[in-house]
Amino acid sequence: MVEVFFKNPACGNRIESVTGSYADYSLDETQLFIHDVDVTKEVIIIPAENVVKIENI
């Protein structure tokens, strides 16, 4: 499990977080994919420049 902290530009760059099974970067490292997020089991894509921190939990 990972918790990803990121800046949300839609909320004035407020730091938010999501929890997923795992996260990996795109091949060109411009996007971070967070897999199996929370209960929904969906994939969230975040621009890599907005990622603040990734923690293993």
Predicted features by range, described:
Residues M1-C11:
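A short beta-strand micro-motif
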Residues K7-P9, V37, E49-V51:
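Generic structural motif
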Residues A10-E42:
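Acidic, low-complexity, intrinsically disordered interaction modules
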Residues S21-A23, I45-I57:
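Structured surface patches comprising rigid loops and adjacent beta-strands/short helices at the edges
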